[in-house]
């Protein structure tokens, strides 16, 4: 096989950019923000738990230019509240009130999973099936302050409305990395599915069985060992655990991994 060593950077779009108030152990506390509806009222900057979920996925169905329903492909997990559903805008029409109307949907959560997505406005002007984006998924927090530690990042383990808890597997002293009022960004993490595609025809690598499919070798946490993954045409699989769907395996930024084909 042909091998190539590559890496994936952080996603470019930031879910949040702001300053921290304080650090305690692995917990970073943030300032409240003016509420959008009432600027005199302080509001928390985050939705509780949303930065540490397994993101749900869904596909829209379109009939006669309208989004008629949304089918859940994966329920996700870890949701404390219903996530926001974003449906991409229509591709035809000229008037946003007549023939180019955005579709709107809302999610229901039960047992920390997205169990239903209800279309409350089908929209108009959809000649194709629009992409449905569901809020959530794993996130990284990165220091963007001009500092010797600039660029350091950590996976978010959990979050409340104004606090995040970082995964600190090396037991670093975060007080020395994140100082009061330091500027940070929170960005979505890549997963095998979001980086290489969840299923055909969107896959960027060849699917197949353990011997015929392209492989992705990801480094194990705090180890020099690499674990092999491949797509079998249905889902991503991890060698040694073929019954499990590995599509939501996190791909760490700026860490080398190996592609074999």
Language model region names:
Residues 43-49, 87, 135-145, 203-222:
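Extended low-complexity, serine/threonine- and proline-enriched intrinsically disordered segments
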Residues 224-261:
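Charged, amphipathic alpha-helical scaffolding segments
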Residues 35, 164-186:
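Short solvent-exposed strand/turn elements
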Residues 28-30, 69-70, 115-117, 158-174:
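Short, solvent-exposed secondary-structure boundary/capping segments
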Residues 1-17, 25:
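Boundary/junction segments of secreted and surface-exposed precursor proteins
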Residues 24-29, 33, 37-137, 147:
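Conserved, function-critical positions that sit in or immediately flank catalytic
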Residues 18-23, 106, 149-166:
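Short beta-strand-centered aromatic/proline hotspots
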Residues 77, 124, 200-221, 242-254:
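Short, low-complexity cationic-aromatic patches
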